[in-house]
Every structure is written in structure tokens, then in C-alpha cells.
Amino acid sequence: MSNYVLALDQGTTSSRAILFTREGDIKQISQKEFTQIYPQPGWVEHNANEIFDTQSWVMRECLQEAGIGAADVVAAGITNQRETTVVWDKATGAPVYNAIVWQDRRTAGFCDELKARGLADVFRKKTGLVLDAYFSGTKVRWILDNVPGARAKAEKGELLFGTIDTWLIWNLTKGKAHVTDSSNASRTLMFNINTGAWDDELLGILDVPRSMLPRVTGSSEVVGDIHPEFLGKAIPIAGNAGDQQAATYGNACLKPGMAKNTYGTGCFMLMNTGTEVRSSQNNLLSTVAWTTPSGRFYALEGSVFIAGAVVQWLRDGLGIIKAAPEVEQLALSVPDNGGVYLVPAFAGLGAPHWDQYARGTMVGITRGATKAHIARAALESIALQTLDIMDCMQKDSGIKLAALRADGGATRNNLLMQFQADVLGVPVERPKVTETTALGAAYLAGLATGFWKSEDEIATMWQLDRRFEPNMSDDKRQHLVYEWQRAVERAKAWVEA
């Protein structure tokens, strides 16, 4: 009898494989980082072959280290950095260009052109998204227009497009499956979330041939098998969801009104809105959460581009810490931020501002400011950006959040979690298994193959590690928020278009 589900978690900085038990506990984790490529300011790329090579390597290592064979694995689930775009040759499988990463800003000018043509509402109504360089559609167009010969080949049906899930599945199945799920498709600017299908009008505006696009499947169904060459035996690929949707599922936010925030490279808050699309009036995104036998579920999403990455910047850019975990003790060495506010708009501002021309800004610096104040301001910026999103989410949904479930690497930072509860004014719940992105992919795969019987069973498996209760006066909270909002205004529109 197979006792495990394998999750392949392909992230922005590393590829990981995690084995989960029937109880939803972690048996083994394997991780490998890969190269970040910055060809020009504002451009971010990955080598698509390196992504697949690292992912297949950790998949093998994970099973070897756990001392189990492929026969012990009932199914595999995939979750991935979303929006990152790969275009490859259908015949050879070779990418025609590096993967263009979700953080990449090179298509900002084209997004402005589309807005000037009055098309923002067309895209918002059909896709739930804003016209921003973040999403895949404009990246595909850039590749077709800037890689010699790419457009001609695409129009002959010789090129394929995929987000990272599609690229992994294509390679794992040896080219047998060119598929994506509805959650990933909903991040492309080419998918109509109301009809659940690619949209010809949007494809026409973006000038992307339909023949390039993958077939859209559910998030919890068998779409193909990992070829026996990789692990010695075929394993069904039975779950697929973009990383933030998978984390929402892994946090068991299965009922409308439940919300989670993932603290990773960026910060991503999603609220389950049920089987109806809830349009945002406050610059949030409406997105597909997942499609399961229970139906197509939607979410409101607020995306913060820079969260944990601000701590990496303290380490790599400023050199004020040697390792990321040191930031908590450094920040705790001062009682407050000393009036220093850091707006980490290194790649523009995401929700709810959507300012591609904002840049990182630090204000309130005096001679008394120290590296500890900067460290504290950096951590606080993560929580304050999250507050901006929660305020909008509550207005759009009409739901007062009862608690926020938190996951991702930065949730290990107790100072950040407590400050988050303080500024939100609601409890923050950290689960025992914080690898909820991978867990969500595992749940979706296990559900499709009968490893877990129902979503009710999955909901009962979620376990609390620690609940952080708000402990800040209203006056102090209001002052922090007021100063933060002043700092954000100073970061906006810094780059002159």
C-alpha cells in the first residue's frame, strides 16, 4: 500500500520536494537553489532547464533520503511560482528564451499602452486582474516580439507556452501532457475566470496564438504520469495549483470568508470567496482559487512584491545581518522603529497601489537611527503592507476577518507575527506544518487518488502551532498606520515614465 504523497514545490529561489504522510506530516524535504539572472535593471530571469533539472534532482533525492521507492508514493502534486513564463520549441523541448519571472518589469511600458487604449476594464472584467507587468500574457508577447524568429514559429504552431507547472509537467511526462490548472491559467491575463476558458478577445489584444496555450484542467485530477525514467516507476500527477492558491488549500481555508497570508519572497493574502467571482472595488485581484469536484472556487488576492526579500536585502545589500534569522534579535534590541519607516518598493508596489514606478524609500532617519531601527522597520513593512491589503479585502467581501492563518518561512519570526496581530487587530494563527504550499499540492493530489477521502477530512487535519493575540493600543496602531501611509506616498511614482 502506498503511504505517501509527493509534493513538488517549484519556488522563486529554489526547487523543493516534500513527502507527506497520510496524517499530513512531513516525512522528508529536499531543496536546491538555482540561479537568479538580472540582465538589466528591472529584468529578472531564470534558466528554464535549470529549473527542471533542480526539480527532478530534489525529487529523486527526497525519495532516496527517505529510504522509500516510487511504489510507496500514491501520487504527486505540483505547485509553482506563478506568472513566470516559459516558451519552448514543441519539437525539441528547448526554451527559446530564459523564463521571464513574475518580478520582471520589462513589459510595464506595454501595459501602459494597453491602459491608454482603454483596455484596463476589459481585462479586469474577464480576468479579475489589473494590467501589470507581473502577469504572464505581456511576457509571452515580449518573447514573441523580441526573440528572432519566435513569432513566425509560434504562428506555425511550433512553439508552446506554459507557466512553470506546465513546463514541469511537460518534461516529467516526456512531452505527453501540455496542461495547466485553472488557478495558474487565471494568472496569465489570457484566461476568462467567468467562463473558465482561454479568451479569444484577450489573445487578440495580446497577439498570442491560441495554439501555444496548454489545456486547462482541474486542480485535483490525474493529468499524466511522471515517466518511469525519473523514479523507476510511473507516479500519477494528480494535483496542480499556483503556489498561493495551494497555500490557501493547505491552510484548510476551504470555506468562504477564511483567509491566509503567505510570508515568502513576497507576501500574498487570499480570501476564499466561494463559487462566485467577487469583483474588487479596492484594487485587489479576483482569481481562481482551485477547481475540484466541489466546483470552481474563487478568491480575492492582495499581492505584496517584496516581503521576505527585504530581509535578504538587509543581508546581501546592506550587510547588516549575516543570516536572515538574525534580523529578529537585531530588531528586538530596540523598543520600536525610532520613527524609521522602510517602504520596500524595489520592484514597484503591488496591491492595493499597483504603482510600477514606485521605488524603495526609507524615511524618518535621524542621527539616532541605527541598523536595529532599520531592521525593525524592514520587518514592520511586511506587516504594514499586509494591513493595507486586509483593509481592502474586508471592504470588498463585507466580511470581518475572525483570524488570519499565516504560513511561509518568515512566520518563524515571532516578532513579526506578534506585530502583525497588533497592527491587524485580529489573531494570527501559525500552523504546525508551515509548509502549507506543498501541503496544499499534496492534498489536491491525494484527494484525486482517494488517499484522502474528502475535503472535510482535510479540514480536520489542520493543526495550530501558536496563536498570536493583538496587544497594541488603538492610539499606537493608528499612529503607526498614519506614518506608514505617509511613507508609502513618498515612494510612489519615483521613476519618471
Curated annotation (Swiss-Prot):
Positions with a binding annotation for ATP: T12, T13, S14, T265, G308, Q312, G409
Enzyme class of the recorded protein, top EC level: transferase
Sequence positions that bind ADP: T12, R16, T265, G308, G409, N413
Binding site for sn-glycerol 3-phosphate: T12, R82, E83, Y134, D243
Annotated positions binding glycerol: R82, E83, Y134, D243, Q244
One cellular component (GO) term of this entry: cytosol
GO MF entry, a single one: ATP binding
Pathway: Polyol metabolism; glycerol degradation via glycerol kinase pathway; sn-glycerol 3-phosphate from glycerol: step 1/1
Domain of life the protein comes from: Bacteria
Enzyme Commission (EC) number: 2.7.1.30
Substrates-to-products reaction catalysed: glycerol + ATP = sn-glycerol 3-phosphate + ADP + H(+)
Record bears the keyword Nucleotide-binding: yes
Sorted UniProt keywords: ATP-binding, Glycerol metabolism, Kinase, Nucleotide-binding, Transferase
InterPro entries (UniProt xref): ATPase_NBD, Carb_kinase_FGGY, Carb_kinase_FGGY_CS, FGGY_C, FGGY_N, Glycerol_kin
Signal peptide: none
A Pfam family that the UniProt record links to this protein: FGGY_C
The keyword Kinase belongs to this UniProt entry's keyword annotation: yes
GO biological process, one term: glycerol-3-phosphate metabolic process
Regulation: Inhibited by fructose 1,6-bisphosphate (FBP).
Similarity-based family: Belongs to the FGGY kinase family.
Function description: Key enzyme in the regulation of glycerol uptake and metabolism. Catalyzes the phosphorylation of glycerol to yield sn-glycerol 3-phosphate.
Name of the protein: Glycerol kinase
Organism encoding this protein: Nitratidesulfovibrio vulgaris (strain ATCC 29579 / DSM 644 / CCUG 34227 / NCIMB 8303 / VKM B-1760 / Hildenborough)
